[in-house]
């Protein structure tokens, strides 16, 4: 079983890149889940199709908040622009794909109707309130069991509309 995360980085990111500490600034599209390794190739293909269907993704910074089990992780909530609830709809579609491939969601209480699109602050940076950006990529990231390093397993380019 692989421990995976789906994000959209605000900073350039490449397949194969390894992060020993934290990830760069990113939107968490799906928090950690486990997936049987034998499902991975088909899973990656289906995620790619979903990402293409929801592309492009445009966001704007909203209010600050704190997430995590102790409410001590500073985040910037975000709003999807353009087609409305695009990030929430993409999140729901990816959840269906995760479930179809026997995925196990680490914190189901933060999923589906409880999903709050956000950017976790990295070195004091996220988006400013009302700041707009287009997301350029969606990434599949694996947390390695022994070291807890995170490796970028796949990167999907988003349409630039």
Q: What do the predicted segments below correspond to?
A:
Residues 140-146:
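Short, exposed beta-strand-loop hairpins at the edges of beta-sheets
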Residues 71-83:
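Short, low-order "capping/linker" segments at domain edges
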Residues 148-150:
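Residue-level signal for glycine
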